[in-house]
């Protein structure tokens, strides 16, 4: 049976499909995608690390120019290989390392606790509230906006642009989505250029000001287009992947009351890794072969694409005992939720801090949080997350806390 990630049952719950395909073949051809796909952990890891498989940007619709959408990808460190990738990553990492992110931990916790109290107020009297717009979405959006120095009054502009752009990462997006993505990219690029111009004249204590000022060893800096693409990439990761990390992780925790009951502050760091493994916010990451590459039992020929299915890798029983069980104390936990190799997620430290702060806040400020009916998922495969997440808050639990 062909692997088709657009099927509603696959979007709703891909993990049984992954398991069935993995039992037959760890790597297979997908007619629906027109590329190879991996179902095993070892094979996905090999795809992500092999230097004969690269991120080679090419617009999928050559007869339909999307100039600003293309600009954001042609100049992105995510879509380039060495030596361009090496230079971009070195410059960006200088202002976005673990040490800089750790300095944000207190602010992230402050934002999370403020949002938790908004949830408490909205749920007063036993009301059902949607946790996505009240908590899971604004937390990462506020954090990345703070990091990049985006004014508070502009934050509402950014997520709709990001959301329109990432819809083109799904298989076979229709024409109207492509046009919407280009419109969003045009507005996004224009906004970020204006913000860069302002920060050139008025540097602040933010990452964008740091990126503008950062020089490489040879004195080179990020170009204007590279600055735009980098700022948008970081914002989009904060708006999409990080939102889904918080939403998916919270749902998984609330769906497993026994695991939630055992969650204590000392378990939070490991619990974060398990929640990312259990329901990966990014399910698919592509590479293109630049030479014949052997992955498992197949040879990926030059020009062919192969997709590492990260969610499938993270449920591989050859690596994870009882992989369909949520185990907050699981260790070791070599999940591929942040990728691997030279394109390992640059924002992983920030995503971890966000989810750690989120879980700690659930423990301290929302002990009575509970699911209130079935949530709804976005109808997308590549970016896996919730559109709604209805919850209630038990006032008696709050009073006891």
Residue ranges of model-derived segments:
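Cytochrome P450
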Residues: 1-401
């Amino acid at each position: 049976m062909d692997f088709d990630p657009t099927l509603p049952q696959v979007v709703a719950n891909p993990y049984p499909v992954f398991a069935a395909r993995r039992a037959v073949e760890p790597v297979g051809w997908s007619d629906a995608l027109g590329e190879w796909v991996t179902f095993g952990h070892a094979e996905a890891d090999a795809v992500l690390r092999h230097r004969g498989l690269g991120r080679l940007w090419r617009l999928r619709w050559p007869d339909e120019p999307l100039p600003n959408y293309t600009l954001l990808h042609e100049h992105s460190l995510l879509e380039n290989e060495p030596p361009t990738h090496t230079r971009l990553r070195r410059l960006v990492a200088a202002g976005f390392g673990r040490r800089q992110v750790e300095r944000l931990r207190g602010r992230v916790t402050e934002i999370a606790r403020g949002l938790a109290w908004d949830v408490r107020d909205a749920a007063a009297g036993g009301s059902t509230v949607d946790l996505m717009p009240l908590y899971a979405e604004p937390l990462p959006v506020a954090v990345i906006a703070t990091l990049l120095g985006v004014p508070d009054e502009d934050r509402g502009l950014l997520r709709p642009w990001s959301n329109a752009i990432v819809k083109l990462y799904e298989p076979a997006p229709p024409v109207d989505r492509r046009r919407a993505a280009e419109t969003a990219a045009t507005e996004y690029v224009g906004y970020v250029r204006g913000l860069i111009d302002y920060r050139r004249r008025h540097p602040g204590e933010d990452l964008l000001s740091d990126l503008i000022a950062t020089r490489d060893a040879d004195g080179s800096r990020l170009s204007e287009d590279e600055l735009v693409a980098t700022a948008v990439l970081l914002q989009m990761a904060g708006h999409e992947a990080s939102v889904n990390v918080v939403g998916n992780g919270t749902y998984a925790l609330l769906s497993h009351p026994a695991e939630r009951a055992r969650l204590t502050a000392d378990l939070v760091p490991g619990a974060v890794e398990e929640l990312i493994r259990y329901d990966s916010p990014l399910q698919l990451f592509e590479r293109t072969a630049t030479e014949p590459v052997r992955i498992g039992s197949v040879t990926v020929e030059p020009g062919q694409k192969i997709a590492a299915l990260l969610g499938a890798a993270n449920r591989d029983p050859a690596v994870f005992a009882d992989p369909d069980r949520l185990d907050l104390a699981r260790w070791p936990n070599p999940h591929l939720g942040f990728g691997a190799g030279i394109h390992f997620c640059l924002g992983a430290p920030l995503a971890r801090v966000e989810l750690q702060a989120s879980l700690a806040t659930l423990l301290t400020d929302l002990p009575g949080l509970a699911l209130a009916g079935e949530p709804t998922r976005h109808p997308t495969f590549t970016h896996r997350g919730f559109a709604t997440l209805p919850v209630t808050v038990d006032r008696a639990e709050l009073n006891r806390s």
